[in-house]
Protein backbone atom coordinates (compact mmCIF):
# COMPACT_ATOMS: atom_id res chain seq x y z
CA UNK A 1 0.00 0.00 0.00
CA UNK A 2 1.01 3.64 -0.44
CA UNK A 3 1.95 5.41 2.79
CA UNK A 4 -0.46 8.29 3.53
CA UNK A 5 1.15 11.70 3.68
CA UNK A 6 2.60 12.20 7.17
CA UNK A 7 3.47 15.52 8.79
CA UNK A 8 6.29 16.53 11.14
CA UNK A 9 4.30 15.59 14.25
CA UNK A 10 3.83 12.07 12.89
CA UNK A 11 7.57 11.68 12.49
CA UNK A 12 8.10 12.95 16.03
CA UNK A 13 5.59 10.39 17.29
CA UNK A 14 7.60 7.65 15.62
CA UNK A 15 10.82 8.92 17.16
CA UNK A 16 9.28 9.04 20.63
CA UNK A 17 7.82 5.58 20.20
CA UNK A 18 11.24 4.22 19.31
CA UNK A 19 13.16 6.15 21.97
CA UNK A 20 10.85 5.62 24.95
CA UNK A 21 8.64 2.64 24.17
CA UNK A 22 10.91 0.17 22.42
CA UNK A 23 9.31 0.84 19.06
CA UNK A 24 6.01 -0.63 20.31
CA UNK A 25 2.82 1.27 19.48
CA UNK A 26 0.83 -0.81 21.98
CA UNK A 27 3.03 0.23 24.91
CA UNK A 28 2.97 3.85 23.78
CA UNK A 29 -0.82 3.88 23.43
CA UNK A 30 -1.27 2.42 26.92
CA UNK A 31 1.09 5.06 28.31
CA UNK A 32 -0.91 7.86 26.68
CA UNK A 33 -4.21 6.35 27.81
CA UNK A 34 -2.87 6.46 31.36
CA UNK A 35 -1.68 10.06 30.85
CA UNK A 36 1.94 9.30 31.73
CA UNK A 37 4.14 12.24 32.70
CA UNK A 38 6.13 11.93 29.49
CA UNK A 39 3.09 12.22 27.22
CA UNK A 40 3.67 14.99 24.69
CA UNK A 41 0.83 17.54 24.52
CA UNK A 42 1.14 17.77 20.72
CA UNK A 43 0.63 14.02 20.28
CA UNK A 44 -3.03 13.03 20.03
CA UNK A 45 -3.92 9.51 21.09
CA UNK A 46 -6.20 9.07 18.08
CA UNK A 47 -3.32 9.88 15.75
CA UNK A 48 -0.99 7.41 17.47
CA UNK A 49 -3.65 4.73 16.97
CA UNK A 50 -4.03 5.73 13.31
CA UNK A 51 -0.30 5.37 12.77
CA UNK A 52 -0.44 1.94 14.37
CA UNK A 53 -3.18 0.95 11.89
CA UNK A 54 -1.19 2.32 8.96
CA UNK A 55 1.84 0.30 10.03
CA UNK A 56 -0.23 -2.87 10.41
CA UNK A 57 -1.70 -2.43 6.92
CA UNK A 58 1.71 -1.70 5.49
CA UNK A 59 3.28 -4.73 7.13
CA UNK A 60 6.50 -2.83 7.71
CA UNK A 61 7.84 -0.61 10.47
CA UNK A 62 7.02 3.02 9.69
CA UNK A 63 10.24 4.30 11.20
CA UNK A 64 12.32 2.17 8.85
CA UNK A 65 10.41 3.58 5.90
CA UNK A 66 10.22 7.22 6.92
CA UNK A 67 12.80 8.39 9.43
CA UNK A 68 16.07 10.01 8.38
CA UNK A 69 19.53 8.92 9.43
CA UNK A 70 19.88 11.89 11.86
CA UNK A 71 16.58 10.84 13.44
CA UNK A 72 17.87 7.30 13.94
CA UNK A 73 21.05 8.72 15.47
CA UNK A 74 19.01 10.73 17.97
CA UNK A 75 16.98 7.65 18.88
CA UNK A 76 20.14 5.60 19.31
CA UNK A 77 21.59 8.27 21.61
CA UNK A 78 18.45 8.27 23.73
CA UNK A 79 18.53 4.48 24.02
CA UNK A 80 22.21 4.57 24.97
CA UNK A 81 21.47 7.01 27.80
CA UNK A 82 18.67 4.75 29.01
CA UNK A 83 21.12 1.84 29.06
CA UNK A 84 23.70 3.85 31.01
CA UNK A 85 21.11 4.90 33.58
CA UNK A 86 19.84 1.36 34.04
CA UNK A 87 23.38 -0.01 34.32
CA UNK A 88 24.01 1.85 37.58
CA UNK A 89 21.42 -0.25 39.41
CA UNK A 90 23.72 -3.26 39.06
CA UNK A 91 26.11 -1.54 41.46
CA UNK A 92 24.27 -1.39 44.78
CA UNK A 93 26.86 0.84 46.47
CA UNK A 94 26.81 3.50 43.75
CA UNK A 95 24.65 5.84 45.82
CA UNK A 96 25.13 9.04 43.83
CA UNK A 97 24.61 7.55 40.33
CA UNK A 98 21.56 5.65 41.59
CA UNK A 99 19.98 8.79 43.05
CA UNK A 100 20.61 10.68 39.80
CA UNK A 101 19.14 7.82 37.75
CA UNK A 102 16.11 7.73 40.05
CA UNK A 103 15.59 11.46 39.46
CA UNK A 104 15.85 11.16 35.68
CA UNK A 105 13.76 8.01 35.29
CA UNK A 106 10.97 8.95 37.71
CA UNK A 107 7.43 8.72 36.40
CA UNK A 108 6.08 10.90 39.20
CA UNK A 109 4.62 14.30 38.38
CA UNK A 110 6.37 15.72 41.44
CA UNK A 111 9.12 13.31 42.51
CA UNK A 112 9.39 14.48 46.10
CA UNK A 113 10.79 11.17 47.33
CA UNK A 114 13.65 11.30 44.82
CA UNK A 115 14.31 15.00 45.47
CA UNK A 116 14.31 14.50 49.25
CA UNK A 117 16.78 11.60 48.97
CA UNK A 118 19.16 13.78 46.95
CA UNK A 119 18.88 16.75 49.31
CA UNK A 120 19.75 14.49 52.26
CA UNK A 121 23.07 13.64 50.58
CA UNK A 122 23.94 17.34 50.51
CA UNK A 123 26.94 18.89 48.77
CA UNK A 124 28.23 15.63 47.27
CA UNK A 125 25.24 15.80 44.90
CA UNK A 126 25.97 19.32 43.64
CA UNK A 127 28.31 18.44 40.76
CA UNK A 128 26.08 15.66 39.33
CA UNK A 129 23.09 17.99 39.55
CA UNK A 130 24.99 20.78 37.81
CA UNK A 131 25.82 18.35 35.02
CA UNK A 132 22.08 17.79 34.53
CA UNK A 133 21.53 21.55 34.29
CA UNK A 134 24.41 21.98 31.83
CA UNK A 135 23.58 19.02 29.57
CA UNK A 136 21.44 19.89 26.55
CA UNK A 137 20.33 16.25 26.34
CA UNK A 138 18.05 16.43 29.35
CA UNK A 139 16.09 19.39 27.99
CA UNK A 140 15.09 17.23 25.04
CA UNK A 141 11.81 15.32 25.53
CA UNK A 142 13.17 12.61 23.23
CA UNK A 143 15.71 11.65 25.89
CA UNK A 144 15.24 10.01 29.31
CA UNK A 145 13.38 12.30 31.67
CA UNK A 146 11.19 13.76 28.89
CA UNK A 147 12.87 17.17 29.30
CA UNK A 148 11.77 17.48 32.94
CA UNK A 149 15.05 16.62 34.69
CA UNK A 150 16.70 20.09 34.72
CA UNK A 151 13.72 21.46 36.64
CA UNK A 152 14.07 18.78 39.31
CA UNK A 153 17.83 19.36 39.48
CA UNK A 154 17.26 23.09 40.02
CA UNK A 155 14.92 22.41 42.93
CA UNK A 156 17.53 20.12 44.51
CA UNK A 157 20.29 22.68 44.04
CA UNK A 158 18.49 25.56 45.69
CA UNK A 159 17.55 23.34 48.63
CA UNK A 160 21.16 22.16 49.07
CA UNK A 161 22.22 25.81 48.84
CA UNK A 162 25.73 25.57 47.39
CA UNK A 163 26.32 28.90 45.56
CA UNK A 164 28.55 27.24 42.95
CA UNK A 165 25.27 26.28 41.26
CA UNK A 166 24.32 29.93 40.63
CA UNK A 167 26.30 30.49 37.38
CA UNK A 168 24.92 27.25 35.93
CA UNK A 169 21.33 28.14 36.76
CA UNK A 170 21.92 31.55 35.19
CA UNK A 171 23.36 30.08 31.99
CA UNK A 172 20.26 27.90 31.71
CA UNK A 173 18.08 31.02 31.37
CA UNK A 174 16.84 32.27 28.03
CA UNK A 175 15.44 29.00 26.70
CA UNK A 176 12.12 28.49 24.94
CA UNK A 177 10.49 26.57 27.80
CA UNK A 178 8.87 29.22 29.99
CA UNK A 179 7.96 26.72 32.71
CA UNK A 180 11.62 25.76 33.07
CA UNK A 181 12.61 29.44 33.02
CA UNK A 182 10.32 30.13 35.94
CA UNK A 183 11.79 27.25 37.96
CA UNK A 184 15.38 28.34 37.29
CA UNK A 185 14.57 31.90 38.36
CA UNK A 186 12.78 30.64 41.46
CA UNK A 187 15.90 28.67 42.37
CA UNK A 188 18.09 31.75 41.89
CA UNK A 189 15.77 33.76 44.13
CA UNK A 190 16.08 31.03 46.78
CA UNK A 191 19.85 31.60 46.89
CA UNK A 192 19.22 35.17 48.01
CA UNK A 193 22.13 37.63 48.29
CA UNK A 194 24.80 35.51 46.54
CA UNK A 195 22.56 35.17 43.49
CA UNK A 196 21.61 38.85 43.58
CA UNK A 197 25.27 39.86 43.68
CA UNK A 198 26.05 37.57 40.75
CA UNK A 199 23.10 38.87 38.72
CA UNK A 200 24.01 42.51 39.38
CA UNK A 201 27.42 41.94 37.79
CA UNK A 202 25.73 40.45 34.74
CA UNK A 203 23.17 43.25 34.61
CA UNK A 204 25.81 45.97 34.25
CA UNK A 205 28.29 43.94 32.19
CA UNK A 206 29.61 45.20 28.86
CA UNK A 207 29.20 44.80 25.96
CA UNK A 208 25.44 44.44 26.09
CA UNK A 209 24.34 40.88 25.33
CA UNK A 210 21.75 38.31 26.34
CA UNK A 211 23.32 38.03 29.81
CA UNK A 212 22.22 41.58 30.63
CA UNK A 213 18.64 40.80 29.65
CA UNK A 214 18.55 37.46 31.47
CA UNK A 215 19.93 39.12 34.60
CA UNK A 216 17.29 41.85 34.42
CA UNK A 217 14.51 39.30 33.98
CA UNK A 218 15.73 37.26 36.95
CA UNK A 219 16.23 40.30 39.20
CA UNK A 220 12.65 41.38 38.54
CA UNK A 221 11.55 38.38 40.61
CA UNK A 222 13.63 39.39 43.64
CA UNK A 223 12.27 41.73 46.33
CA UNK A 224 12.88 45.37 45.41
CA UNK A 225 16.41 46.46 46.21
CA UNK A 226 17.87 49.97 46.21
CA UNK A 227 21.31 48.93 44.97
CA UNK A 228 19.79 47.05 42.03
CA UNK A 229 17.42 49.93 41.35
CA UNK A 230 20.23 52.49 41.22
CA UNK A 231 22.18 50.29 38.80
CA UNK A 232 19.12 49.88 36.57
CA UNK A 233 18.40 53.62 36.64
CA UNK A 234 21.99 54.37 35.64
CA UNK A 235 21.68 51.95 32.72
CA UNK A 236 18.54 53.76 31.54
CA UNK A 237 20.62 56.89 30.97
CA UNK A 238 22.37 55.08 28.13
CA UNK A 239 20.36 55.72 24.97
CA UNK A 240 21.11 52.26 23.58
CA UNK A 241 19.65 50.64 26.69
CA UNK A 242 16.66 52.96 26.80
CA UNK A 243 15.77 52.13 23.20
CA UNK A 244 16.27 48.40 23.63
CA UNK A 245 12.69 47.09 23.47
CA UNK A 246 13.55 43.90 25.35
CA UNK A 247 15.89 45.28 28.00
CA UNK A 248 14.42 48.69 28.90
CA UNK A 249 11.07 47.50 30.33
CA UNK A 250 12.88 45.32 32.87
CA UNK A 251 15.22 48.15 33.81
CA UNK A 252 12.21 50.36 34.48
CA UNK A 253 10.63 47.60 36.56
CA UNK A 254 13.78 47.35 38.67
CA UNK A 255 13.67 51.10 39.34
CA UNK A 256 10.77 50.51 41.73
CA UNK A 257 13.46 49.98 44.37
CA UNK A 258 14.54 53.64 44.24
CA UNK A 259 13.78 54.88 47.75
CA UNK A 260 15.05 58.44 48.17
CA UNK A 261 12.88 61.39 47.09
CA UNK A 262 15.84 62.68 45.05
CA UNK A 263 16.16 59.47 43.02
CA UNK A 264 12.42 59.21 42.54
CA UNK A 265 12.28 62.78 41.27
CA UNK A 266 15.13 62.09 38.82
CA UNK A 267 13.23 59.05 37.55
CA UNK A 268 10.12 61.18 37.11
CA UNK A 269 12.12 63.72 35.10
CA UNK A 270 13.53 60.95 32.92
CA UNK A 271 10.16 59.61 31.84
CA UNK A 272 8.90 63.16 31.14
CA UNK A 273 11.64 63.83 28.61
CA UNK A 274 10.44 64.11 24.97
CA UNK A 275 13.09 61.56 24.01
CA UNK A 276 11.69 58.94 26.41
CA UNK A 277 10.19 56.11 24.30
CA UNK A 278 6.40 56.30 24.13
CA UNK A 279 6.05 52.54 24.47
CA UNK A 280 7.66 52.77 27.93
CA UNK A 281 5.49 55.62 29.28
CA UNK A 282 2.97 53.27 30.90
CA UNK A 283 5.73 51.24 32.54
CA UNK A 284 7.22 54.42 33.94
CA UNK A 285 3.85 55.65 35.23
CA UNK A 286 3.31 52.30 36.93
CA UNK A 287 6.52 52.78 38.90
CA UNK A 288 5.46 56.30 39.91
CA UNK A 289 2.11 54.99 41.16
CA UNK A 290 3.90 52.31 43.20
CA UNK A 291 5.62 55.06 45.19
CA UNK A 292 2.43 56.86 46.16
Language model regions located:
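Extended alpha-helical scaffolding segments
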Residues: 12-50, 216-292
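Generic detector of bulky aromatic hydrophobic side chains
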Residues: 3-11, 178, 182-183, 203
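Structural detector for internal amphipathic alpha-helices that build alpha-solenoid repeat scaffolds
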Residues: 49, 80-89, 109-123, 142-160, ...
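Aromatic-residue detector
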Residues: 30-45, 98-99, 103, 145-146, ...
Amino acid sequence: MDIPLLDEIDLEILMHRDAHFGGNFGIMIEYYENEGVGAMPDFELDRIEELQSIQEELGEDLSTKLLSMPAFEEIAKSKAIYSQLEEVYKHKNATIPILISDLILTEEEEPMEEITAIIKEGEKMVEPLIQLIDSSDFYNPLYPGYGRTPAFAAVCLDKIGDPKAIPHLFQALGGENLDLEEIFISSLVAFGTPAKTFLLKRLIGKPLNKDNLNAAVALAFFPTDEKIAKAAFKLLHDEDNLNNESFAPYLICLCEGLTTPEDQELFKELIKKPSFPKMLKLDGQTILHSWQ
